[in-house]
Amino acid sequence: MKVVSFVNMKGGVAKTTLSINVADCMATRHGLRVLIIDLDPQFNATQALVHGSDYVGYLEQGGHTIVDIFDDNPRVQTSSVKGESPAQPLALEEIKPMVRKDNLFLLPGALELYRLDMSGGQGREHRLKRYIDIVKNSGLYDLVIIDTPPTPSTWMSAALIASDYYLVPVKPEPLSVTGVDLLRNVINRVKENYSLGIECLGVVLTISDERETVYKNAKEYLDSAAFWKGKRFNKSLLKRTEIARRQGNQELILDTDDSKLKMAIADITREALQKLGLED
């Protein structure tokens, strides 16, 4: 089982869009059992995959979220059936993801993640790694994809500690492109602090129009910069204004009738699987 974190320190680069659609394509087109872990306190991946009313119902029925991994203190749990009741922290072995569709599973995010004290010295940043080790030993999944917050944080560190690889979505604009070097410095610092062997799976240009100068400039920079040379995926995620609207309706790229967009996500997914050694 391989674990990949999708990371970038800038919002608006289609990080979540890329992560959930690559996961869906791996599950739908390649028959892999994929677990998405939503580690972003804004839980955009969860909102793009689960309708709001279904999410509320899931919580009311006692469904588990990312908070259950990191919160080791008793807390009040609200249920439409039982009302408010004290809830003891779960053992990591007890935490079960929800089923999104055949082969695609989700450990949802939650705004409640914001209330947790993740200051240094508590060791909570290692809890995700311990959970993923349990998941790995279960044999239930072929791949775990972690959607991370767009800021350097303990959450990002937790994701990197738990991962074998990281993938960087980059929007072809000057600030995003130059920001990848800052991101690399942050990742290197985490690698050194925790003695990690995590590797870069690659860079995917997103929200791309190959006719635009900014796209050509971004491509040229990534293909010539010492560290990033050879790491750019051959295919880019195309610019489509309707993607955000469709995600608001929990529609994934493979659900659309946009053949070029579907081909792009299929090619990106295939290249990722080749890099991971999981190609068909």
Segments (PLM) and residue ranges:
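P-loop NTP-binding core
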Residues: 1-280
